[in-house]
Amino acid sequence: MVFEVIPAVDMRGGKCVQLVQGVPGSEIVSIDDPLAVALDWVSKGAKTLHLVDLDGAIEGERKNSPIIEKIVNTCKEKGVSIQVGGGIRSFEDAASLLEIGVSRIILGTAALQNPELVKQLSSSFGSSHVNVALDAKNGKISIKGWTEECAQTPVEMGRKFEELGAGSLLFTNIDTEGLMQGVNPVPTKELVESVSIPVIASGGVSTLEDIKTLKKTGAAGVVVGSALYMGRFTLEEAINAALGDI
């Protein structure tokens, strides 16, 4: 299995942004045209894009749906897979995205508050289209745009969602997210070894070495945001690092 590097296109107020630890107002990147950003990553070799509606994640209102649909329609024609998260709170929200050609919907808060939703979506659309985001802070699950902490651990919830029909997991270590201080592979490795479905890692990648480190955990891929936008390395360099021997 190829370890995939997935560029993040996070959107807030119709712009492509990168936040520090998900905190509104902490933008370190703000670009007016998310579609142009998405197409730029595709031209540089991205096979999958990670789109997040931050307005949806933080406020529960998916304000960036029109631009997401534009990106999906444009990238579909180029054979690029799109995974979308942020504010998907209901079966209808998820279905509307899958029906326009989104490859994978990412459920966070909704899955934790209503686990049956995972079962319903995987039964209706197939488990390969359903991803559950497990965002962890201090070893515990965090929800509602990282503003509330739960008692459960990522391993407990990962096993539960695999049983319910999730086809993959997205694991974000909030402790390192957006800080550009490197990754902690331990929690990712623990989760990978606890489930049999693919785990995509996210949070804190700042060097090519971080990509190699996460590959060694057995993860299926990594979402990269700030490091790419700030020019720490190019997407081509990241893809080559992911393909290299470890």
Swiss-Prot record:
GO terms of biological process kind: L-histidine biosynthetic process; L-tryptophan biosynthetic process
Catalysed reactions, as listed in the record: 1-(5-phospho-beta-D-ribosyl)-5-[(5-phospho-beta-D-ribosylamino)methylideneamino]imidazole-4-carboxamide = 5-[(5-phospho-1-deoxy-D-ribulos-1-ylimino)methylamino]-1-(5-phospho-beta-D-ribosyl)imidazole-4-carboxamide
Key words, A-Z: Amino-acid biosynthesis, Cytoplasm, Histidine biosynthesis, Isomerase
Keyword Transcription set for record: no
Active-site annotation: D10, D135
This protein's record includes keyword Amino-acid biosynthesis: yes
Alphabetical list of Pfam families matching this protein: His_biosynth
Pathway where it operates: Amino-acid biosynthesis; L-histidine biosynthesis; L-histidine from 5-phospho-alpha-D-ribose 1-diphosphate: step 4/9
Protein name: 1-(5-phosphoribosyl)-5-[(5-phosphoribosylamino)methylideneamino] imidazole-4-carboxamide isomerase
Classification of source organism: Archaea, Methanobacteriati, Methanobacteriota, Stenosarchaea group, Methanomicrobia
